[in-house]
Amino acid sequence: MTEHLLAMNQKLKNPDEALSLFGNQDSFLKLMEKDLNLNIITRGETIYVSGDDESFQIADRLLGSLLALIRKGIEISERDVIYAIKMAKKNELEYFESMYEEEITKNAKGKSIRVKTMGQREYVAAMKRNDLVFGIGPAGTGKTYLAVVKAVHALKNGHIKKIILTRPAVEAGESLGFLPGDLKEKVDPYLRPLYDALHDVLGADHTERLMERGIIEIAPLAYMRGRTLDDAYVILDEAQNTTPAQMKMFLTRLGFGSKMIITGDVSQIDLPKGVKSGLAVAKEMLKGIDGISMIELDQTDVVRHPLVAKIIEAYDKQN
């Protein structure tokens, strides 16, 4: 193998830039070495690569793309590097860079929220384009989080008056009346992921204030019956655990000026044996209807710990 001096368009300007690009203790470079079968050596702000010409070219483009993002003030994470490597191997780095061009909104700490994968980009675009969107895929793909982010963004911009978040309490058989405690105590354990997303985007205090004013409503699916939801962003989470009747009931609540986002994972159905999933039925029945988007995410869109994607892939192969 031939040692190359990696020829970048611009040299690294300072140690801080090098740290952002290389990762803590060169962790990002180690990921590249492993995935691209290279040896990468750094001397100050200069990079040397030992590997074949093809791998060298991939690494050159990869580091150039990451550096371009860093110079735009975007903080690079391990997940970003892993996804960038995949895109570089497919010669699709221009799409990787373009994902970071649009900020959806900022979280409670003022940090920019952006899509992290091409699948997420398609999902967010669908939510902008259509009033009814299904986000279907495994855990960790950002289905629920991005739906909440878009809902908050719509509320901040005055496009809607209310956010409604719901999910079936299938673990309790939707029979919450048989559980001890008041409604909030009964419902909260099943809706915790929705609270977590809201707290990240709005902060816990702001979320509570909006809930007290009725601007944000979090409730079990059974409480949607008989309502028409106008000027609202309505999110149904864990939709794989609805029955077809529950799904129909929910979808027909859609009112004027509203959007509905339905998220779920058809591989994680917890319904009693023999009961069909409302999400699985809707996925087939509503496919191709104008104004409805069916977005399917997969393990390449997982934005949790890198091992999560590998675990999902292993189980998918088994099934």
Curated annotation (Swiss-Prot):
Any one GO molecular function term: ATP binding
Record's signal peptide: none
Domain of life: Bacteria
Subcellular localization(s) per the UniProt record: Cytoplasm
Pfam family, one: PhoH
The keyword Magnesium is assigned to this record: no
Location (main, coarse): cytoplasm
GO cellular component: cytosol
Gene3D superfamilies xrefs: P-loop containing nucleotide triphosphate hydrolases
UniProt-annotated binding residues for ATP: G137, P138, A139, G140, T141, G142, K143, T144
Record keyword Lipid biosynthesis present: no
Keywords per UniProt: ATP-binding, Cytoplasm, Nucleotide-binding
Family annotation (PANTHER family): PHOH-LIKE PROTEIN, PROTEIN PHOH
Similarity comment text for this entry: Belongs to the PhoH family.
Protein name stated in the entry: PhoH-like protein
The species this protein was found in: Bacillus subtilis (strain 168)
Lineage: Bacteria, Bacillati, Bacillota, Bacilli, Bacillales
Gene from which this protein is expressed: phoH
